[in-house]
Amino acid sequence: MLYYLLKYINEVFDPPGLGVIEYLTFRASAAAITALLITLVAGPGFIALLRARFIEPVKEEAPPEHRKKKLPTMGGLLIIISVEVSVLLWAKFTDPHVWLIMLALLWMGVIGFIDDYSKVVLKVKGGLSARWKLVGQISLGLVVGIYTSMDPVFSVLMRETTVPFFKNLTIDYGIFYVPVVIFIITALSNAVNLTDGLDGLAAGSSAIVIFGLGGFAYLAGNVVYASYLSIPFIPGGGEIAVVCMAATMACVGFLWFNANPAEIIMGDTGSLALGSTIAVTALLIKQELLLPVLGGLFFLETLSVSLQVLYFKYTRMRFGEGRRIFLMAPLHHHFQLKGWAEQKIVIRFWIVTILLFLTSLMTLKLR
C-alpha cells in the first residue's frame, strides 16, 4: 500500500529522491526493517497476551531439561503478522508471486494455529491429527500446483526445473508437476516443524534459508543476471525478494525473544507456515531441487526421524525388540542427550546451515 501511495506521489508531484521507491533493493530493505521493527516493538505485549492463556503443554518424551519449560506458544502469529504487514506496505502485492507466497504463509499458519489451539486450549492430546494436517498440506499443494500450471504467468516455466551443478540440464515434470508440488510443500512444512525443538533453532535456520532464497529470487528476476548464471528468468520474480527479506527479518526479530532462554515459542503456527513459505518460494523461482542443499538441516532432521522409526520397526520384527540408531530423534535431541548444551547445538546447527547456504551459492558457478 505504501509503495503505491509513494509511487502516486512521485508521479504527480515528482519530489526529489522519491523515485527510489521503484528500486527493488530499497523496497526489500524497507520491508526487512519494517518486519524487524514490528516484531521487536510488538513482541513484549504479544508475549504477555499469549502467556495469559496459551502455554505449551510439556511433552513427557522430551529430554529432562525440556520438561521444566512452560512457555507461551503460537508465537508464529507474530512472524506471520510482521511479514504480511511489511509485504502489504512495500511489495507489489498485485504480483501473483507475492500473493501465492502470502497464501502459503497464511494457509499453513491457520492449520498450525488450529493444532496449537487444540493442544493448549481444548486440551486435545497431540492436537490436530496428522490426517487433518496432511489434508491442509495437500489442499495447499493442489491450489498452488493447479493455479501455477494453468495461469499464463506461470505455466510456461512451472513444469520444468533446473538441476543444481548442471548448466543446461532440466527436468520436465509433465503430469507429475502437481504431485511434486504437493510433496515438496508437505515435506518442507513437516521438516521445519520437526526442527522446531530447541530455542532459536527453527527461527534462525529458517532466516538463513529464506535469505538465501531471496538472493536467488533477486537474481532470477533480473534477465541479465539470470542469463549470465544460467538460471531460469522469472518475469516479475524479483518481488519475491521483498517477501523473503520481510520473512527473514521477521524470523530474526522473533529470535530476539526465542533465543535461549526463550520467552516464547513459535509453535506449529510458525513452523508449518515457514516451511510452506520456503517450499512455495523455491517452487516459484525454480530452485526446489536446491532445497536438499540450502535447507539441508531440515532434511537431516527429517531423515533422522525416518531412519529411527524404520530401524526400530525392522529390529523389533527381526529380533523381537526395537533398537534405535539415535539416542532420540529428531537429530538435535540426540546431541542433547549426548550432553551437548542447548546453545551449542543451536549455534552449530546454524553454522551448518550457513555452510549449506554458501554451498548453494557455489552451485551458481559450478555448472
Curated annotation (Swiss-Prot):
Keywords: Cell cycle, Cell division, Cell inner membrane, Cell membrane, Cell shape, Cell wall biogenesis/degradation, Magnesium, Membrane, Metal-binding, Peptidoglycan synthesis, Transferase, Transmembrane, Transmembrane helix. GO terms for molecular function: metal ion binding; phospho-N-acetylmuramoyl-pentapeptide-transferase activity; UDP-N-acetylmuramoyl-L-alanyl-D-glutamyl-meso-2,6-diaminopimelyl-D-alanyl-D-alanine:undecaprenyl-phosphate transferase activity. Its EC number is 2.7.8.13. One of its GO terms (cellular component) is plasma membrane. It catalyses: UDP-N-acetyl-alpha-D-muramoyl-L-alanyl-gamma-D-glutamyl-meso-2,6-diaminopimeloyl-D-alanyl-D-alanine + di-trans,octa-cis-undecaprenyl phosphate = di-trans,octa-cis-undecaprenyl diphospho-N-acetyl-alpha-D-muramoyl-L-alanyl-D-glutamyl-meso-2,6-diaminopimeloyl-D-alanyl-D-alanine + UMP. Signal peptide: none annotated. PROSITE patterns: MRAY_2. It is a multi-pass membrane protein. It is found in: Cell inner membrane. GO terms for biological process: cell division; cell wall organization; peptidoglycan biosynthetic process; regulation of cell shape. InterPro entries: Glycosyl_transferase_4, PNAcMuramoyl-5peptid_Trfase, PNAcMuramoyl-5peptid_Trfase_CS. NCBIfam families: mraY. Belongs to the glycosyltransferase 4 family. MraY subfamily. Catalyzes the initial step of the lipid cycle reactions in the biosynthesis of the cell wall peptidoglycan: transfers peptidoglycan precursor phospho-MurNAc-pentapeptide from UDP-MurNAc-pentapeptide onto the lipid carrier undecaprenyl phosphate, yielding undecaprenyl-pyrophosphoryl-MurNAc-pentapeptide, known as lipid I. This is Phospho-N-acetylmuramoyl-pentapeptide-transferase. The gene is mraY.
